[in-house]
Amino acid sequence: MQRSHELFERARQHIVGGVNSPVRAFTGVGGEPPFIARAEGPYLYDEDGNRYVDYVCSWGPMVAGHAHPKVVRAVQAAAADGLSFGAPTEVEIRMAEKLKAMLPSLERVRMVNSGTEATMSALRLARGHTGREKIIKFRGCYHGHVDALLVQAGSGALTLGIPGSPGVPAAVVEQTITLPYNDAEAVRECFQRMGDEIAAVIVEPVAGNMNCVPPVPGFLEALRECCDDHGSVLIFDEVMTGFRVGVQCAQGRYGITPDLTCLGKVIGGGMPVGAFGGKAQIMADLAPEGPVYQAGTLSGNPVAMAAGLATLALVDDPATHRALEEATATLVDGLRERAEAAGVSVSLNQAGSMFGLFFTDQNPVTTFEQVQACDLEAFKVFFHAMLEEGVYMAPSAFEAGFLSTAHDTPAIEYTLAAAERAFARVARR
């Protein structure tokens, strides 16, 4: 990949680490990243002319595949009318109406520019609404690079082996309580000790930043029960799971209604966007109606709203999500069969069109500790073998994989043929 190598060398002269988000630098797997020139459907094409079946999907947003004609046309039409106004527009109303129609828990909505902004703002709102300061998060869950939440985080922080981050004052995180994910009893014990001090519980209902770890039965129910009993705000970070694991996101899939929901990724169709919303009584505390301040220069950007609306229209259908889930199951089952045939121990998880591959003999994988104990060296061998075969998976053992509606039978069959050879390489190492 000569051209990609040259671009990476050039990037490192001007951009910190050569990338604008750490995981893209391949720190977790070694080697150098391909630089992408374009994408279409389920495929990426790099600067050296190589084609890859893409299971990163821009880290989740591209649920309808890359460069979907309807999304592209919507963006072109919106851009022709102006890129940003800093003033109210009809399209942001339409987006709010669409989100509320698809997700009944959203009584009121506020658009922002990223998932990090959404979680940061939701936490501030929960603290302002309750008058409390303590928050609960879970080990291995990542909610963006918010100071108060960058504690035992997943995603890139986990890939780089950073349990927290320099630059985050101890005073900022001393009100953050970190508990084990999928441990309902630990949550109940914490609430028994200090429930009346807890402003909010924030959780990824499917943990997608320590690979893909769905909730065990009873875990989300315990969060809802404890928050109800103590007047705390339950926040679902559905930035990743939103419209990924079902028409009504993870909350619809598992039947648990949060007080606030954070969204991003899919609702922008590939454009920078985020949103948070929930109970009208809580959202009423947000400026300009209430005292909790939040603002953004580009919030509700008309081009991002147009891309998001076009994308949501493509997946606002239970049949579409069933087909996505079936395609993902075909991939997951095929990977499991080929690993077993090669004599390689793996465990696979799935939630909708998200999946996780773990090199371990523990099955199922349900905890952060199990994820940390996986064979990272085996993953590195598998990752590079797949990349050489033309399959682009997340360059970290701690990131989930994704499918899109564009991942058809030929793409999946190609992937499984490549995986058969990749697992054989893992077995020989």
UniProtKB/Swiss-Prot annotation:
UniProt subunit comment: Homodimer.
Enzyme class, broadest EC rank: isomerase
Keywords for this protein: Cytoplasm, Isomerase, Porphyrin biosynthesis, Pyridoxal phosphate
Family, as annotated: Belongs to the class-III pyridoxal-phosphate-dependent aminotransferase family. HemL subfamily.
Catalytic activity line of the entry: (S)-4-amino-5-oxopentanoate = 5-aminolevulinate
Cofactor dependency: pyridoxal 5'-phosphate
GO cellular component: cytoplasm
Subcellular location: Cytoplasm
InterPro entries (alphabetical): 4pyrrol_synth_GluAld_NH2Trfase (IPR004639), Aminotrans_3 (IPR005814), Aminotrans_3_PPA_site (IPR049704), PyrdxlP-dep_Trfase (IPR015424), PyrdxlP-dep_Trfase_major (IPR015421), PyrdxlP-dep_Trfase_small (IPR015422)
SUPFAM superfamilies for this protein: PLP-dependent transferases
The gene coding this protein: hemL
Pfam families the record matches: Aminotran_3
GO biological process, one term: protoporphyrinogen IX biosynthetic process
EC numbers: 5.4.3.8
Designated name of the protein: Glutamate-1-semialdehyde 2,1-aminomutase
Pathways per UniProt: Porphyrin-containing compound metabolism; protoporphyrin-IX biosynthesis; 5-aminolevulinate from L-glutamyl-tRNA(Glu): step 2/2
Organism listed in the record: Alkalilimnicola ehrlichii (strain ATCC BAA-1101 / DSM 17681 / MLHE-1)
Gene Ontology MF: a single term: pyridoxal phosphate binding
Modified residues (N6-(pyridoxal phosphate)lysine): K265
